[in-house]
Amino acid sequence: MHSDDPQQLELLRVCRIGRAQGLKGEVTVQIFTDEPEYRFAPGAVLYTKDGEEEYVVESSRTFKNRWIIKFEGIDDRDASEAANGVVLYGEADDPEEMLEADEWYPKDLISLEARLAEGNTLGLAPGTVVGKVVDVIEVAQWLLKIRLANPVKDADGVVVENSALVPFVDELVPDIDLEGGYLTLDPPGGLIPGL
């Protein structure tokens, strides 16, 4: 994987190797991907952050909501214990293919302008700038943190609300235009302060 080419593929964090599982080299992993079936398919290649070491998936399985992976060359408990704590990365998908498939990474949404959607339920002018996406928070459901273009102030002019959390679902975020640098929102009343 190591390359002196400055245009080498971007690596995304996929997992952290955890405890040894059994005696034959299997390990548990803490996952950081929403595509574990793809990332842990037999033959999939993962890398250390510097791209110097490759870890090839030999087999994978789930047990009680945990992924258990067997990597090529890690064949006993000693080798699996030695790998504990190693963080592995995978190659990012091709950006052009992702755009065609209407897919994106959370980091791609940060800094997009948030505008009101056409025909929004609030009845406000479409295209009205609500703010800018400053973070994508992953809890039970992804949330977009939007810094408001017009912060809400109290009677004394002190800012009391300068951001809003919007669930990242199709109904509330109907359009994303990465090339145009914006996304549209169709929030219900009360979700975004000041609207």
UniProtKB/Swiss-Prot annotation:
It is found in: Cytoplasm. GO terms for biological process: ribosomal small subunit biogenesis; rRNA processing. Residues 101-191 form the PRC barrel domain. It holds the Pfam family RimM. Keywords: Chaperone, Cytoplasm, Ribosome biogenesis, rRNA processing. Disulfide bonds: none annotated. The keyword Transmembrane helix does not apply. An accessory protein needed during the final step in the assembly of 30S ribosomal subunit, possibly for assembly of the head region. Essential for efficient processing of 16S rRNA. May be needed both before and after RbfA during the maturation of 16S rRNA. It has affinity for free ribosomal 30S subunits but not for 70S ribosomes. Binds ribosomal protein uS19. This is Ribosome maturation factor RimM. It comes from Bifidobacterium adolescentis (strain ATCC 15703 / DSM 20083 / NCTC 11814 / E194a). The gene is rimM.
